[in-house]
From Swiss-Prot:
Modified residues (Phosphoserine): S432, S435, S438, S449, S452, S514, S553
Skewed-composition ranges (Polar residues): 423-439
Modified residues (Phosphotyrosine): Y68
Parts of the chain that traverse the membrane: none
Modified residues (Asymmetric dimethylarginine): R476, R482, R484
Function comment: mRNA-binding protein that acts as a regulator of mRNAs translation and/or stability, and which is required for various processes, such as neurogenesis, muscle development and spermatogenesis. Specifically binds to AU-rich elements (AREs) in the 3'-UTR of target mRNAs. Promotes formation of some phase-separated membraneless compartment by undergoing liquid-liquid phase separation upon binding to AREs-containing mRNAs, leading to assemble mRNAs into cytoplasmic ribonucleoprotein granules that concentrate mRNAs with associated regulatory factors.
GO biological process, one term: negative regulation of translation
Protein name: RNA-binding protein FXR1
CDD domains: KH_I_FXR1_rpt1, KH_I_FXR1_rpt2, KH_I_FXR1_rpt3, Tudor_Agenet_FXR1_rpt1, Tudor_Agenet_FXR1_rpt2
Gene expressing this chain: Fxr1
Keyword annotations from UniProtKB, A to Z: Acetylation, Cell projection, Cytoplasm, Developmental protein, Differentiation, Isopeptide bond, Methylation, Myogenesis, Nucleus, Phosphoprotein, Repeat, RNA-binding, Spermatogenesis, Synapse, Ubl conjugation
Modification Phosphothreonine occurs at: T398, T430, T512
Miscellaneous comment as given in the Swiss-Prot or TrEMBL entry: This protein corresponds to isoform B in mouse and isoform 2 in human.
Amino acid sequence: MAELTVEVRGSNGAFYKVFIKDVHEDSLTVVFENNWQPERQVPFNEVRLPPPPDIKKEISEGDEVEVYSRANDQEPCGWWLAKVRMMKGEFYVIEYAACDATYNEIVTFERLRPVNQNKTVKKNTFFKCTVDVPEDLREACANENAHKDFKKAVGACRIFYHPETTQLMILSASEATVKRVNILSDMHLRSIRTKLMLMSRNEEATKHLECTKQLAAAFHEEFVVREDLMGLAIGTHGSNIQQARKVPGVTAIELDEDTGTFRIYGESAEAVKKARGFLEFVEDFIQVPRNLVGKVIGKNGKVIQEIVDKSGVVRVRIEGDNENKLPREDGMVPFVFVGTKESIGNVQVLLEYHIAYLKEVEQLRMERLQIDEQLRQIGMGFRPSSTRGPEKEKGYATDESTVSSVQGSRSYSGRGRGRRGPNYTSGYGTNSELSNPSETESERKDELSDWSLAGEDDRETRHQRDSRRRPGGRGRSVSGGRGRGGPRGGKSSISSVLKDPDSNPYSLLDNTESDQTADTDASESHHSTNRRRRSRRRRTDEDAVLMDGMTESDTASVNENGLGKRCD
């Protein structure tokens, strides 16, 4: 504002230093130095320009000069008109022209200057032009330092922003300034906008730098969230980030969207860790045994839904057999969970506990099945003697190598009006390999004894009948020789076992005994013989091998007991 300094004449005739604030048609708005008087408008005829700063100060006795002085202590100093009366070294005796001749004062050379020869200003002494300022630049234009280069380029005396008119005021003592302003004003506003943007970025960078320096000394954590889980981490409308920022002690949370990196700064490690718990979403899987998948899911998904609700995970997915995204163990099915780290830890605890519970229950169930199996073998595998009643039930237990499930007991009744006697049996003993595994050695001996006590005539008759019907067969003698043509049991003895492996093998003894002891007519006996003959026919290679094995077993059993020898 020193460049727009002018002098205003006061009521006492002295000229005081003022600054031009605005230019009007016939006056100037001025501001007094040190604001010793309020701002006011002064007409042109009371205003003059100050003398040039490089004026030569050659003062001698008798010259009119201007003295920088004041009339009283309440007023500032101004330039008063005076006359030099005497000089002595650097001191001058002056006489004020506006006062009585008797009022003199001794002053130094620095307070004197030659009389200002400038006239009062006129309408064309100062020129003013205006530039409209956009709304986004008004705050920036209020700073006069922003127009320093523009002021120098156009040759203006002063450039300032007028808030009432929202315009830039350019004041100058040269008319050429107005033309330059018209040329450079648009460029000046663009430069202000660019500078403003750069300054704003620099300020933000400075603040960020200061904040980073402060946070670097505090607690902070950095972690990465997968791109497909970033939406869960941010939350709806940034709800998770807002919730994390509300944690007491958290000072800042930064997110690098390009890399999915979160940076959390806080005053304590606990605050930072708590905020991290709201933002860190991960995906993890747990291996579940295949045989327990259904029980882990539960009916209508009730069990797995309860686990999800209690743990707090967002979602759960069961990987299919045709998916190979995750490492898979034999006999295991991966359950994939998505949620915060805390919720993933919760679901691991719940699921591992539930799986352990299911395994323990399964183990107890298997133990119970084994106990039940042993009870069946002990209680149902016992063979009573041949004198049991016709309505008595007979049970057996099967080996795991032959039948996969346990069959129930079956009851069979005899035929005819009576039995031939307890000593009559069929021509075949029960094969030990097909009998109940719980059968004891004593039971087998009893069976062989019954077989050996059968009538020799009856056995011989059957042997001859079978020999005539199958002359080419290898007959089996009573003494225990091996062959396919020997005496056999009834029709249902072997063929029934081959047709129905799950049937009760002890029923053969009962049926054979009943058939041979029944008091029947000749036709009924002939029909029974035909049935026994048909049962001995080989249907397949496997059937022949089975019967051969039974023959060898029966022969060996008879020879061992010494009951197979025949006395001719």
